[in-house]
Amino acid sequence: MNVQVLDRYEIVKSLGSGGFGDTFLAKDTQIPSQKLVVIKRLKPANANSNTSTELIQKLFEKEASVLEDLGEHNSQIPKLYSYFSNDNEFYLVQEYIQGVSLNEIAPISSEQAKTILSSLLTTLKYIHSKGIIHRDIKPENIILRDSDHLPVLIDFGAVKETMGAVTLGSGSTVSSVVIGTRGFMAPEQSSGRSVFSTDLYALGLTIIYTLTKKLPVEFSSDQQTGQLDWQSHVSKIDSVLAKVINKAIEMEPSRRYSSAEAMYQALHSLISSGAEPALPMETVRVAPSNEFLVTRSSTKTAETVVKPVGNSHNNYSNNNGKSKIATLLTVLIGIIVVTAGLGGGFIITQQIKEAEARAAQAEKEKQEAEQKRIEAEQKIAENEKRQRELEQKRVEEERQRLAAEAERAKQERQRLAAERQRVQVLANQAKAMASGASATIGGIPGSKNIRSGPGTDYGVITQGYTGEGLDILDSSTDSSGHVWYKVYHYGSGSTGWIASQLVNF
């Protein structure tokens, strides 16, 4: 586009336009790397109102300084490099976050959604601790950064809200516009009464979008409670995540989580206790291990009966047949009992193994989620530590630079003073030679005392300066034997005494 802002930022392309202004991708041409930045150009929404530009300027600078502080101390909020105004337009120059928005990657899995939600809640905890409400959370305003895959929260609504400032007849200032995106705004937000749970409401709907790739208006809702029917659009929904989201998107603020911290704790406490219970197992009666043995040992042998000899063969045949049948039945019953016992035991064993496997998988997933959370928090802590170290290093380097600059300035002042004295001495000497003086004042450049008599006991009658002309009139010694000259001082026109070591012939 080859358009520049402040003769510094070269516009690369437009990133979007809205009711409050325009957003551009630009290059910072005044640094060697020509780093990419995002420039937001904002315009007052009520150009013809009674609200003064000075008031909007003041509100803009206040909110911009808050945004600068947030980005400086949290790596998941873009840094604010600069802010300024020009021709009744207001500019923010921010860090360019390279990555993809949640709008672009949807739909995602429940596990991915939980990780993103946990990380964003950590960021919101920090933002809310500063008394700030984002006001415009939606999929487009959350970027998964390429460098570390952490979700970055962009486009805070507070600065844009200042563009709608108007002054009431009572003298108080309010915003005449509502910041937010239709479908993601909580009911209280449309009336200008945003609270911390307003952000949680929008975050819940944003996570629903990442799971379904559907806007809130595309879901049917319960006519009595207003609850959205979104879970039927997710093929495999995590029950823990669903429970947390449903509470966050309650219509009444009092029914939602009171804070990002509360929602974060709910998400992780449910995950910690969220191992699926084993499915109810069918009760199967299994014979005790010794039942088959009891059945065999309790089988009665044929009873001995005395019969007439003539019928002995028939009796034997009948009894023997019955005994064989009884034995066969006993064996069959035993086999059936053992088989039933083995089958039932196999079913129970399988169900126990399956339950144990499910519990182990749930525990593994919980540990992985916790590990991801810890790693994300460690990265945040490392980034914050690195930022603090860089800031300390910058402050120390700046202190050393200022000290070195002060020392150079001091040396320069001393050099100039010495140079001035040297020039003055040369000038005095030239003047003395021109006047026909027989001698000049010598010694280190500066003033010298001319006294009323030969010695330091006498008072000072005037002062001469190195290089000024003298005429020698007489000489004498003081009480210590030091030689003094009585001189006529051309500079003052006075006659007095000066120590011999201060006279050059």
UniProtKB/Swiss-Prot annotation:
Residues 436-505 form the SH3b domain. Pfam families: Pkinase, SH3_3. The keyword ATP-binding applies. ATP binds at L15, G16, S17, G18, G19, F20, G21, D22, T23, K40. Keywords: ATP-binding, Kinase, Nucleotide-binding, Serine/threonine-protein kinase, Transferase. The keyword Membrane does not apply. Its EC number is 2.7.11.1. The active site is at D136 (proton acceptor). It is an enzyme of class 2 (transferase). Signal peptide: none annotated. Residues 9-271 form the Protein kinase domain. PROSITE patterns: PROTEIN_KINASE_ATP (PS00107), PROTEIN_KINASE_DOM (PS50011), PROTEIN_KINASE_ST (PS00108), SH3B (PS51781). It catalyses: L-seryl-[protein] + ATP = O-phospho-L-seryl-[protein] + ADP + H(+); L-threonyl-[protein] + ATP = O-phospho-L-threonyl-[protein] + ADP + H(+). GO terms for molecular function: ATP binding; protein serine kinase activity; protein serine/threonine kinase activity. It comes from the Bacteria. InterPro entries: Kinase-like_dom_sf, Prot_kinase_dom, Protein_kinase_ATP_BS, Ser/Thr_kinase_AS, SH3-like_bac-type. Belongs to the protein kinase superfamily. Ser/Thr protein kinase family. This is Serine/threonine-protein kinase D. It comes from Synechocystis sp. (strain ATCC 27184 / PCC 6803 / Kazusa).
